UniProtKB/Swiss-Prot annotation:
Signal peptide: none annotated. It is found in: Cytoplasm. This is Phosphoglycerate kinase. The lineage of its organism: Bacteria, Bacillati, Mycoplasmatota, Mollicutes, Acholeplasmatales. InterPro entries: Phosphoglycerate_kinase (IPR001576), Phosphoglycerate_kinase_N (IPR015824), Phosphoglycerate_kinase_sf (IPR036043). Pathway: Carbohydrate degradation; glycolysis; pyruvate from D-glyceraldehyde 3-phosphate: step 2/5. Pfam families: PGK (PF00162).
Length: 399
């Protein structure tokens, strides 16, 4: 179902409310340690400016549980960074509502940019943002003529700053970043070019059950590494030593393996250590030879070779979750090799990284520009891959 985007509406002299995801990591001194989420929103912001919008930006930042949290989670440094990136002033209003904000909005001229304070400051008073307080959504909606949602990172949440505003606006459209997320992830699930390979990793099966079930319906192969692989191995009768296993998920793992009809591939071997430690002694063990006092912390060389062979022929790949403890050098090889294999598909296949740790791994290895799409939403991309309807996508008008 085609969604309306910012390109489909008139912006000149319109007050444009734009929900962005500027939930960036901050250093102790308040400076921004990674501005990826800001740069990801630039195409939409610059498009709106170019078309003569009066732009009103807002986002959440961190979690606000006490009044003290406000001091360390202000969007002020974000506004300053955005101003540097777009080369024009960004008026920052340190409020989430009130006369100062209303007056500043009224004073905006075509091409001006304003940002107001962290939407979650409203959570100090009865979680108004996170619980989608109807009055708050209505108030924010009253500040603008049209609503643009460009925050995929919060698309799986129904908050006042997305769904609440949309419920009170005649026009709600997707920004260019949200459009890209819908096109890439939605396209992979609905109409993938084949072979379609899904690569899953991370620690727990329980985090990815629905993703596995949904991907088994559409993918040609599902490669599973990381900690979650050991629950599947245990379910097949292998002894996995001290490796991470979810005992309460063994029956489910068996069920998924049967359901997969050979689509799930776990490989052949693992890299083990005696402890979860960067200095532990490592060994390569086949699945049937993992000692009781060792734990698997990365996929082994034969598994790497098998995964690379499958990836090489793929036309669509979705990757969510590292293959090992890539933060430790001794257990980074599996994730590195998978990243490189996907980078080698550049220009030959669609490669999608589902946010979170996988995106961090791609960044660590410096291969971001070799991927078709790196999702800006961890939880949102996971729920999208589960086949769920995301509130922040559903609110967008249909063409």
């Amino acid at each position: 179902m085609a969604k309306k985007t910012i390109r489909d509406i008139e912006l000149k002299n319109k007050s444009v409310l734009m929900r962005v995801d500027f939930n960036v990591p901050l250093n102790k001194d308040g400076s921004i340690s990674d501005d990826t989420r800001i740069t990801a929103a630039l195409p939409t912001i610059e498009y709106a400016i170019e078309k003569g919008a009066k732009l009103i930006l807002f986002s959440h930042l961190g979690r606000i549980k006490t009044a003290e949290d406000k001091a360390t989670n202000s969007l002020k440094p974000v506004a300053a960074r955005l101003s540097e990136l777009i080369g024009r002033p960004v008026v920052f209003i340190p409020e989430t509502r009130g006369e100062a904000l209303e007056a500043a909005v009224k004073n905006l001229k075509s091409g001006d940019v304003l940002m107001f304070e962290n939407t979650r400051f409203e959570d100090l008073d009865g979680n108004k943002e996170s619980k989608n307080n109807p009055e708050l959504g209505k108030y924010w909606a009253s500040l603008g003529d049209v609503f643009v949602n460009d925050a995929f990172g919060t698309a799986h949440r129904a908050h006042a700053s997305n769904v609440g505003i949309a419920n009170n606006m005649e026009v709600s459209v997707a920004g260019l970043l949200l459009e890209k997320e819908i096109n890439f992830i939605g396209g992979a699930l609905e109409n993938p070019e084949r072979p379609f390979v899904a690569i899953l990793g991370g620690a727990k099966v329980s985090d990815k059950i629905e993703v596995i079930k949904n991907l088994l319906k559409v993918a040609d192969k599902v490669l599973i590494g990381g900690g979650m692989a050991f629950t599947f191995l245990k379910a097949q009768g292998f002894e996995v030593g001290k490796s991470l296993v979810e005992l309460d998920k063994l029956d489910l793992a068996k069920e998924l393996l049967e359901l997969s009809k050979g689509k799930i591939e776990l490989g052949f071997d693992v890299v083990t250590g005696k402890a979860f430690d960067k200095d532990t002694e490592t060994n390569v063990r086949s699945f049937d030879a993992i000692p009781a006092d060792e734990m698997g912390l990365d996929i082994g060389p034969k598994t790497v070779a098998r995964f690379k062979e499958i990836i090489a022929s793929a036309k669509t790949v979705v990757w969510n979750g590292p293959q090992g403890v890539f933060e430790m050098e001794k257990f980074a090889n599996g994730t590195l090799e998978v990243t490189k294999a996907l980078a080698d598909l550049h220009g030959k296949a669609i490669t999608i990284v589902g946010g979170g740790d996988s995106a961090a791994a791609v960044a660590k290895f410096g291969l971001e520009d070799k991927f078709s799409h790196i999702s800006t939403g961890g939880g949102a991309s996971l729920e999208y891959l589960e086949g769920k309807v995301l509130p922040g996508v559903e609110l967008v008008d249909v063409i």
